[in-house]
Amino acid sequence: METVVIVAIGVLATIFLASFAALVVVCRQRYCRTKNLLTNYNNKPTVDLIGAMETQSEPSDLELDDVVITNPHIEAILEDEDWIEDASGLVSHCIAILKICHTLTEKLVAMTMGSGAKMKSPSSLSDIIIVAKRISPRVDDVVRSMYPPLDPKLLDARTTALLLSVSHLVLVTKNACHLTGGMDWIDQSLSAAEDHLAVLREAALATEPERPMTGADNFLQEQSAI
C-alpha cells in the first residue's frame, strides 16, 4: 500500500515541476529580454497538468523514479531571482511560496518512502491521496493568477488556498507516518511561506476602497479629539 501513496505524492511533485515550467515559458515570452531557459522543454497545457493528476487515481506498482519527471532547467529557474520583470513586486512572493510548497512536497515524498512500514491503515493512505489530489489544481490556479494583469486580491486568495492545502497534506502525512520529532523544518518552511503571504495580503488590502465614515465613527473621532 505504501507504493500507492508514493506514486500519488510523486505525481504531485511532477505537477509542481510542470507548473513552474509552464509559468516560466509564458512569462519569458511576455516580459524577459533574455533567452528562454526552457527551449528544450516540452510544455504541457494547464488542462493537461490537471488531467495528468486525475489519471493517476488508481493504485500502481510504478516506482517513484518512474513517476517523477525532472526538467534539467528547473534548478536554474528556481535559483534565478531576477528572471521576471515585475513592477508590482508581487510575483516574486508567489514564486517563493511555490518554491516552498515544491520543497515540502519533495521532502514529504522522501519521508513517505522511509515510513512505509509505519503506515497506520489503508484509510490513512487514502487520506494522503485525496489531499494530494486537491493541491494540483491549487498550483495551477496560482500560476494562472500570475499572468498579467495582476490582481492582488486574486493572488492573495489563491496562494492562501494553496498553502492551506499543503498544510493539510503535512498534517495527514505526519499522522499517517507517525512523524513526531525533528519536524521543525516543516514549521519553519510554512512560517516563511506565511511571511510571503502576508505581503500579498497587505497588497490586496491596499486595493480595498476606503470605507465611508459613519455617524458613529465621526462621534468617536470627535470624542478622541477632546
UniProtKB/Swiss-Prot annotation:
InterPro entries according to UniProt: TMEM98
Listed Gene3D superfamilies: I/LWEQ domain
GO cellular component: endoplasmic reticulum; endoplasmic reticulum membrane; extracellular region; plasma membrane
Segments crossing the lipid bilayer: 4-24
Localization: Endoplasmic reticulum membrane; Cell membrane; Secreted; Secreted, Extracellular exosome
Record membrane topology: Single-pass type II membrane protein
Protein name: Transmembrane protein 98
Keyword annotations of the record: Cell membrane, Endoplasmic reticulum, Membrane, Secreted, Transmembrane, Transmembrane helix
GO biological process: negative regulation of myelination; negative regulation of oligodendrocyte differentiation; negative regulation of protein localization to nucleus; negative regulation of protein processing
Source organism of this protein record: Xenopus laevis
Protein family membership: Belongs to the TMEM98 family.
PANTHER family (UniProt xref): TRANSMEMBRANE PROTEIN 98 (PTHR32510:SF3)
